[in-house]
Amino acid sequence: MQLATDAVGAQDRLRTALKGVGHDVVLIDCPPSLGLLTVNGLVAADRVVVVSEPAAWASDGVAQMLRTIERVRDRQRTELVTAGVVVNRLGRTRDARYWHEQLVASYEDLVVGPIHLRAAIAEASAQSLPLHALGQRAGAEIAAAEFTALLAQVVPDLSPKDA
Protein backbone atom coordinates (compact mmCIF):
# COMPACT_ATOMS: atom_id res chain seq x y z
CA MET A 1 0.00 0.00 0.00
CA GLN A 2 1.43 3.36 -1.02
CA LEU A 3 0.69 5.77 1.81
CA ALA A 4 3.07 8.67 1.93
CA THR A 5 5.13 8.95 -1.24
CA ASP A 6 2.80 11.35 -3.08
CA ALA A 7 2.05 14.63 -1.30
CA VAL A 8 -1.40 15.03 -2.88
CA GLY A 9 -3.92 13.47 -0.55
CA ALA A 10 -1.22 11.71 1.47
CA GLN A 11 -2.95 12.32 4.80
CA ASP A 12 -6.12 10.59 3.64
CA ARG A 13 -4.61 7.47 2.09
CA LEU A 14 -4.91 5.16 5.09
CA ARG A 15 -8.47 6.30 5.84
CA THR A 16 -9.41 5.65 2.20
CA ALA A 17 -7.72 2.22 2.23
CA LEU A 18 -9.60 1.21 5.39
CA LYS A 19 -13.04 2.11 4.04
CA GLY A 20 -15.02 -1.03 3.55
CA VAL A 21 -12.76 -3.16 5.75
CA GLY A 22 -15.10 -5.62 7.43
CA HIS A 23 -13.87 -5.22 11.00
CA ASP A 24 -15.40 -3.46 14.00
CA VAL A 25 -11.99 -2.54 15.41
CA VAL A 26 -8.78 -1.84 13.52
CA LEU A 27 -5.67 -1.14 15.59
CA ILE A 28 -3.18 1.20 13.92
CA ASP A 29 0.23 1.13 15.63
CA CYS A 30 2.07 4.29 14.61
CA PRO A 31 5.76 5.10 14.96
CA PRO A 32 6.81 7.25 17.93
CA SER A 33 7.06 10.40 15.84
CA LEU A 34 4.81 13.12 14.52
CA GLY A 35 5.58 12.45 10.86
CA LEU A 36 3.28 11.70 7.95
CA LEU A 37 2.73 8.04 8.89
CA THR A 38 1.44 9.06 12.31
CA VAL A 39 -0.74 11.77 10.79
CA ASN A 40 -2.13 9.13 8.38
CA GLY A 41 -3.01 7.00 11.40
CA LEU A 42 -4.64 9.93 13.20
CA VAL A 43 -6.71 10.91 10.17
CA ALA A 44 -7.93 7.31 9.79
CA ALA A 45 -8.67 6.82 13.49
CA ASP A 46 -11.81 7.32 15.57
CA ARG A 47 -9.90 7.31 18.86
CA VAL A 48 -6.29 7.61 19.90
CA VAL A 49 -4.24 6.17 22.73
CA VAL A 50 -1.09 8.19 23.34
CA VAL A 51 1.72 5.94 24.57
CA SER A 52 4.54 7.40 26.64
CA GLU A 53 7.29 6.16 28.90
CA PRO A 54 8.18 7.40 32.39
CA ALA A 55 11.17 9.51 31.37
CA ALA A 56 12.40 13.08 31.16
CA TRP A 57 10.71 15.04 28.38
CA ALA A 58 7.85 12.52 28.19
CA SER A 59 5.35 15.17 29.23
CA ASP A 60 6.56 17.41 26.40
CA GLY A 61 6.11 14.56 23.92
CA VAL A 62 2.57 13.92 25.15
CA ALA A 63 1.79 17.64 24.87
CA GLN A 64 3.08 17.70 21.28
CA MET A 65 0.98 14.66 20.38
CA LEU A 66 -2.15 16.16 21.96
CA ARG A 67 -1.60 19.37 19.96
CA THR A 68 -1.19 17.30 16.79
CA ILE A 69 -4.41 15.41 17.56
CA GLU A 70 -6.20 18.75 18.02
CA ARG A 71 -4.83 20.03 14.69
CA VAL A 72 -5.96 16.86 12.89
CA ARG A 73 -9.38 17.15 14.54
CA ASP A 74 -9.73 20.80 13.45
CA ARG A 75 -8.40 20.43 9.91
CA GLN A 76 -10.08 17.15 9.07
CA ARG A 77 -13.32 18.03 10.90
CA THR A 78 -13.33 14.64 12.58
CA GLU A 79 -14.65 13.40 15.91
CA LEU A 80 -11.20 12.06 16.84
CA VAL A 81 -11.26 11.16 20.55
CA THR A 82 -8.24 10.93 22.81
CA ALA A 83 -9.06 7.72 24.66
CA GLY A 84 -6.16 8.03 27.04
CA VAL A 85 -2.47 8.42 27.75
CA VAL A 86 -0.85 5.15 28.78
CA VAL A 87 2.49 4.98 30.52
CA ASN A 88 4.34 2.02 29.06
CA ARG A 89 7.41 0.23 30.44
CA LEU A 90 6.87 1.51 33.99
CA GLY A 91 9.78 0.14 36.00
CA ARG A 92 10.34 -0.08 39.74
CA THR A 93 12.94 2.66 40.00
CA ARG A 94 12.48 5.90 41.90
CA ASP A 95 13.13 7.78 38.66
CA ALA A 96 10.39 5.88 36.80
CA ARG A 97 7.94 6.53 39.65
CA TYR A 98 8.82 10.23 39.62
CA TRP A 99 8.24 10.65 35.87
CA HIS A 100 5.04 8.59 36.04
CA GLU A 101 3.77 10.90 38.79
CA GLN A 102 4.65 13.93 36.63
CA LEU A 103 2.64 12.54 33.72
CA VAL A 104 -0.31 11.76 35.99
CA ALA A 105 -0.15 15.28 37.47
CA SER A 106 -0.06 16.86 34.01
CA TYR A 107 -2.70 14.68 32.35
CA GLU A 108 -4.66 13.21 35.26
CA ASP A 109 -7.96 12.98 33.39
CA LEU A 110 -6.36 11.14 30.47
CA VAL A 111 -3.86 8.76 32.09
CA VAL A 112 -4.87 5.09 31.91
CA GLY A 113 -2.92 1.94 32.70
CA PRO A 114 0.01 1.80 33.30
CA ILE A 115 1.77 -1.10 31.62
CA HIS A 116 4.66 -2.23 33.81
CA LEU A 117 8.07 -3.23 32.51
CA ARG A 118 8.09 -7.04 32.43
CA ALA A 119 10.38 -9.58 30.83
CA ALA A 120 7.31 -11.52 29.65
CA ILE A 121 6.35 -8.67 27.31
CA ALA A 122 9.78 -8.67 25.66
CA GLU A 123 9.72 -12.47 25.47
CA ALA A 124 6.29 -12.55 23.82
CA SER A 125 7.35 -9.86 21.36
CA ALA A 126 10.58 -11.68 20.48
CA GLN A 127 8.62 -14.88 19.81
CA SER A 128 5.80 -13.07 17.96
CA LEU A 129 3.31 -14.50 20.43
CA PRO A 130 0.42 -12.94 22.31
CA LEU A 131 1.06 -12.64 26.05
CA HIS A 132 -1.75 -15.08 26.76
CA ALA A 133 0.19 -17.77 24.86
CA LEU A 134 3.09 -17.65 27.33
CA GLY A 135 0.99 -19.47 29.90
CA GLN A 136 2.63 -19.86 33.31
CA ARG A 137 5.84 -17.95 32.55
CA ALA A 138 6.72 -15.41 35.21
CA GLY A 139 4.81 -12.16 34.78
CA ALA A 140 2.94 -13.22 31.65
CA GLU A 141 -0.45 -13.54 33.31
CA ILE A 142 -0.08 -10.21 35.12
CA ALA A 143 1.08 -8.46 31.94
CA ALA A 144 -1.81 -9.93 29.96
CA ALA A 145 -4.23 -8.73 32.65
CA GLU A 146 -2.77 -5.21 32.43
CA PHE A 147 -3.32 -5.12 28.67
CA THR A 148 -6.85 -6.52 29.03
CA ALA A 149 -7.66 -3.83 31.62
CA LEU A 150 -6.16 -1.15 29.39
CA LEU A 151 -8.27 -2.31 26.46
CA ALA A 152 -11.40 -2.12 28.62
CA GLN A 153 -10.49 1.46 29.59
CA VAL A 154 -9.78 2.78 26.10
CA VAL A 155 -12.42 0.79 24.18
CA PRO A 156 -15.21 0.39 26.74
CA ASP A 157 -17.80 -0.40 24.06
CA LEU A 158 -15.87 -3.51 22.99
CA SER A 159 -17.45 -6.61 24.47
CA PRO A 160 -15.21 -9.25 26.14
CA LYS A 161 -15.92 -11.75 23.34
CA ASP A 162 -14.51 -9.24 20.82
CA ALA A 163 -11.25 -8.71 22.73
Regions found by a protein language model. Give the residues of each.
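Beta-strand-loop-alpha "switch" segments that mediate conformational coupling across diverse proteins
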Residues: R89-T93, H100-H132
